[in-house]
From Swiss-Prot:
UniProt cross-references to InterPro entries, sorted A to Z: ARF_dom, ARF_plant, AUX/IAA_dom, B3_DNA-bd, DNA-bd_pseudobarrel_sf, PB1-like
UniProt source species: Oryza sativa subsp. indica
Encoding gene (name): ARF16
Protein name: Auxin response factor 16
CDD domains per UniProt: B3_DNA
GO cellular component, one term: nucleus
Family as reported in the entry's similarity comment: Belongs to the ARF family.
Residues in the DNA-binding region annotation: 127-229
Domain of life: Eukaryota
SUPFAM superfamilies assigned to the protein according to its UniProt record, in alphabetical order: CAD & PB1 domains, DNA-binding pseudobarrel domain
């Protein structure tokens, strides 16, 4: 070997008797995957890999490599010296290393090992070419690729004919070689002619060998060669046996390990299958990688042009390569399989530090009823990982938490995820559960279905008010429960009971809450039937009789006040009269006069003092009235059954799903709200108990039932029934019936307001809410509502101007004192708006297994998103100011807005397109045109188009038929005619942002899917496209949403 020298990695090559080998040229000849550790760093030496190098050089099988018993499978050493070598005859590169085993190592050596991983010793400018037969012929020359010649060689003088120049390059041994570089031929090409034949003959190059030209850091032109691997004859055993070489190498390493003495090894990167001296930092990093069977990985391999390529593979086994001689060794402990069939030549066992594990996402195979991927839905935020996004896309009811807790399902409340999946596997369990869920809600949702299906002519924002009060008003019904208890009698006991129940766990609270909820829903349905029948009866009575009865009743009331003493029975009777005022017909039967102040209720009954016992005639009249009420109840039940039969099964299922989802949203309250609900229930139970005590004091339930079920409870409604539409009446009763859910509010029962008085106030216009409730309580409620600035709700004072009666809402004047939601709906700015039907088909289907409703988009039925639309300023209501339009446009705009419901006291729920709970449908099943057909203003369906340097434009994407029309129109708008239509022009790129905020190229998707998914369009220049490819975004320009759509945090709805 000649021209041998040594040079450290850090210092520059030293000058001495012999020239040092250029490090960049050495690494270029060694290969792109070779990286030597720096001197002074810590390395891991594997004797097993060293033996493989010897076996490869001797052309011997690996199974015949002998072992050494006292030598461990690896040694942690310190690299003392490193010398680069090149064979003088073959130019084969190798390195000599001096290692010293260490038991302890300092921090500096560890840092040097880590820094060695970041050093790149490969040359920046080089090219490598495998020689062909013509390149190695004596009469020809070396053909150089054009780009390589222009990059590496000095520029030619093209004024000469032909252009030519002389090149001087040095090899590994610092020998200079001269070549003539000429540009000639047809077609013209770069050739090395003079001097090339001498170089090929001197180096004994053959076809298949490779030649490298590089420019080092000093811009010197260097030349190197790589010889192809060819079978060589094995050395004669008389010269040197392979076993003796193996034993000598292993013995030297074992001696050094026992005595901590230095030993020398030689590493040939072109002959050795793998590196057997690994930086300690690289080894430690690989050990932290958790590998498992089936894991995907990448591995780098060298290409013919001295480049690198990654091949994909799968781990098929983990274990020792040679468990007998090298036990518990990490050398090639992974058995792998390669994806490509051309990779069959590659070895089937690799080491853990040679691979790059691929963290594949966790895919879920959803059941068939889950929604499909297209059309694309707005997803979860960009900062979520792929596992959470997969869960939320496949299982929409999981919301933001998919832990193993009892998640409230949107289809079956109270079922956990495991139970729901088990029911899907067992159709019998699913059928039984569906029947169990349907039964307690059918009665309470009968009129609610009319509210959705039959009231298509009313303003959708009024329906929002009704639904919101249904969710939050606690047990607000006519004549069903005691709405205003006597606080002097019942304050202490509910307070003690609430203290005891607050200590109970949250699980017991939820169970009690569900039980009371089911009971009160059934009771509300019964009372609703009674009140409807009373309302129909009262419509036939003239208004004059009501006035006369009210005046006579007022006179009798004044007389009863003077006769009644202040005892407990009198106070209870006064409470009952305030809650259940008797009708005018009952006053006539009892012989009592009437007065105009009938609506204020009696303050006393002839049951205290001298009037404690009713007369026989009055008792018989009371019994007759009770029988009459029982007959009315039976007829109303029959009428309701006929109404349920007339309703179609899809309508029943749609309304049932909406009600269950509302209850599911309210059941996700935090424990503090649940404790408040328990306190509410305790107060309600005390009220029921006091009512039962009053029934015993009256001597039976007949008289109480007569007073309770009196038709006069609907007397204040008579002035409104003449002008209200039937749909509005049904809606008001639906609000009263559904408001009995105890889980919908945490307000104390004393703050509830009777719906009769609210309806009366809507008609009178001069009465205040303080007529029935103490003024300090109302002041506290208003302070609580106004003290929450985060609700994003506009607290407006209702206008005192005269409003047409068809625009009034019966229950709009009630104040909600719920601490779970704490908002006051403002309906006055939105009275004239109508909402178009959304997704009336292909979104709700019936499961054929049990005829239970299964929806493709469960989240879309939640009214929370539509409530959010009504909460901000009037500027955000532009999406509600039109009649009907194409369903695809409505879906585009709805899905572009992700509403946050934190201000409503429930977890975040994103509003997704697909189906809306506020669809206006007529009895025939067709979309309704709305009540105000004279409004011609349409919703904005336009999509924003932006181009940097130009004013943004808006286009109606639905009026185009294909991509060609869209490109042509956009090019004309922005003055770039002919540059968008030509696919070969690179000046401008047309991209769009979909609902997942992904930036895609216009034209890849089918036109129909593009129209349904486009959110905004941008025209990017070539520089912007390049910047986007580097940064992964639009160069700092945030993607614009659709016109008049809400942003992710609903700030766009603010004025």
């Amino acid at each position: 070997m000649k021209d041998q020298g040594s040079s450290g990695v850090s210092p520059a090559p030293g000058e001495g008797e012999k020239k040092a080998i250029n490090s960049e040229l050495w690494h270029a000849c060694a290969g792109p995957l070779v990286s030597l550790p720096p001197v002074g760093s810590l390395v891991v030496y594997f004797p097993q890999g060293h033996s493989e190098q010897v076996a490869a050089s001797m052309h011997k099988e690996l199974d015949n490599i002998p072992g050494y018993p006292s030598l461990p499978s690896k040694l942690i050493c310190k690299l003392l010296s490193l010398t680069l070598h090149a064979d003088s005859e073959t130019d084969e590169v190798y390195v000599q290393m001096t290692l010293q085993p260490v038991n302890k190592y300092d921090r500096d050596a560890m840092l040097a090992s880590e820094l060695g991983l970041k050093q790149n010793k490969q040359p920046a400018e080089f090219f490598c070419k495998t020689l062909t037969a013509s390149d190695t012929s004596t009469h020809g020359g070396f053909s150089v690729p054009r780009r390589a010649a222009e990059k590496i060689f000095p520029p030619l003088d093209f004024t000469m004919q032909p252009p030519a120049q002389e090149l001087i390059a040095k090899d590994l041994h610092d020998i200079s070689w001269k070549f003539r570089h000429i540009y000639r031929g047809q077609p013209k090409r770069h050739l090395l002619t003079t001097g090339w034949s001498v170089f090929v003959s001197t180096k004994r190059l053959l076809a298949g060998d490779s030649v490298l030209f590089i420019r080092d850091e000093k811009s010197q032109l260097l030349l190197g060669i790589r010889r192809a691997t060819r079978p060589q004859p094995a050395l004669s055993s008389s010269v040197l046996s392979s076993d003796s070489m193996h034993i000598g190498i292993l013995a030297a390493a074992a001696h050094a390990a026992a005595n901590s003495s230095p030993f020398t090894i030689f590493y040939n990167p072109r002959a050795s299958p793998s590196e057997f001296v690994i930086p300690l930092a690289k080894y430690n990093k690989a050990l932290y990688t958790q590998v498992s069977l089936g894991m995907r990985f990448r591995m780098l391999f060298e290409t013919e042009d001295s480049g690198v390529r990654r091949y994909m593979g799968t781990i098929t086994g983990i274990g020792d390569l040679d468990p007998v001689r090298w036990k518990n060794s990490h050398w090639r402990n992974l058995q792998v399989g390669w994806d490509e069939s051309t990779a069959s030549e590659r070895r089937t066992r690799v080491s853990i530090w040679e691979i790059e594990p691929v963290a594949t996402p966790f895919y879920i195979c959803p059941p068939p009823f889950f929604r499909p991927k297209l059309p694309k839905q707005p997803g979860m935020p960009d900062d979520e990982n792929e596992v959470e996004s997969a869960f939320k896309r496949a299982m929409p009811w999981l919301a933001d938490d998919f832990a193993l807790k009892d998640v409230q399902s949107a289809l079956f409340p109270g079922l956990s995820l495991v139970q729901w999946m088990a029911m899907q596997q067992n159709p019998q369990m699913l059928t039984a559960a569906s029947q169990t869920v349907q039964s307690p809600y059918l009665n309470s949702n009968a009129l609610a279905m009319q509210d959705v299906m039959g009231s298509s002519n009313e303003d959708p924002t009024k329906r929002l008010n009704t639904q919101a009060q249904n969710m939050v008003l606690p047990n607000l019904q006519v004549g069903s429960k005691v709405d205003h208890p006597v606080m002097s009698q019942h304050q202490q006991q509910p307070h003690q009971l609430s203290q005891q129940q607050q200590v109970q766990p949250s699980q017991q609270s939820s169970v009690v809450l569900q039980q009371h909820q089911a009971q009160l829903l059934q009771q509300n349905a019964i009372h609703l039937q009674q009140q409807q029948e009373h309302l129909q009866r009262q419509q036939s009575q003239p208004a004059q009789q009501l006035k006369a009865a009210s005046s006579l009743h007022s006179v009798e009331q004044h007389k009863l006040k003077e006769q009644t003493s202040g005892g407990q029975v009198a106070s209870q009777a006064q409470m009952l009269n305030q809650i259940f005022p008797p009708s005018s017909s009952q006053l006539q039967q009892l012989g009592l006069p009437k007065s105009p102040t009938h609506r204020q209720g009696l303050t006393g009954l002839p049951i205290a003092g001298s009037l404690q016992q009713p007369t026989l005639t009055q008792t018989s009249q009371v019994q007759q009235a009770a029988e009459y009420q029982q007959a009315l109840l039976q007829s109303q039940q029959q009428q309701q059954q006929l109404q349920l039969q007339q309703l179609s099964q899809p309508e029943v299922q749609l309304q049932l799903l909406q009600k269950i989802q509302q209850q599911n949203m309210l059941s996700q309250l935090n424990p503090q709200h649940q404790s408040q609900l328990i306190q509410q229930l305790s107060q309600k139970s005390q009220e029921i108990l006091q009512q039962q005590i009053l029934q015993h004091q009256f001597g039976g339930s007949d008289s109480i039932g007569q007073l309770k079920q009196s038709p006069s409870q609907q007397a204040p409604l008579n002035h409104m029934t003449g002008s209200l539409t039937p749909q509005q009446l049904v809606r008001s009763h639906s609000a009263l019936a559904e408001s009995g859910d105890p889980s919908s509010s945490t307000a104390p029962s004393t703050s509830r307001i009777s719906p009769i008085n609210s309806l009366s106030r809507a008609n009178q216009g001069s009465r205040n809410l303080t007529d029935m409730v103490a003024t300090p309580q109302i002041d506290n409620l208003l302070q609580e509502i106004q003290s929450k600035p985060d609700n994003r709700i506009k607290n407006d004072i209702q206008s005192k101007e005269t409003v047409p009666i068809h625009n009034r809402h019966p229950v709009s004047d009630q104040l909600d004192a719920s601490s779970a939601t704490s908002f006051c709906l403002d309906e006055s700015p939105r009275e004239g708006f109508s909402f178009p039907p959304v997704c009336l088909d292909n979104n709700v289907q019936v499961d054929p297994r049990d005829n239970f409703l299964i929806a493709e988009n469960v989240d879309a039925l939640m009214p929370d998103a539509l409530l959010s639309r009504g909460m901000a300023s009037g500027k955000g209501m532009c999406t509600l100011t039109s009649g009907q339009r194409d369903h695809r446009d409505v879906e585009n705009e709805l899905s572009s807005a992700a509403f946050s419901s934190q201000s409503f006291g429930v977890p975040d729920m994103s509003f997704k397109p697909g189906c809306s709970s506020d669809v206006a449908v007529t009895d025939a099943g067709m979309p309704s045109q709305g009540l105000w057909n004279n409004q011609t203003q349409r919703m904005r369906t336009f999509t924003k188009v932006q181009k940097r340097g130009s004013v943004g434009r808006s286009i109606d994407i639905t009026r185009y038929r294909d991509y060609d029309e869209l490109r042509h129109d956009l090019a004309c708008m922005f003055g770039i005619q002919g540059q968008l239509e030509d696919p070969y022009r690179m000046d401008w790129k047309l991209v769009y942002v979909d609902h997942e905020n992904d930036i895609l190229l216009v034209g890849d998707d089918p036109w129909e899917e593009f129209v349904g998914c486009v959110k905004s369009i941008k025209i990017l220049s070539a520089a912007e496209v390049q910047q986007m490819s580097l940064d992964g975004d639009l160069g700092g320009v945030p993607p614009q949403t659709q016109a008049c759509s809400a942003s992710d945090d609903a700030n766009a709805w603010r004025g």
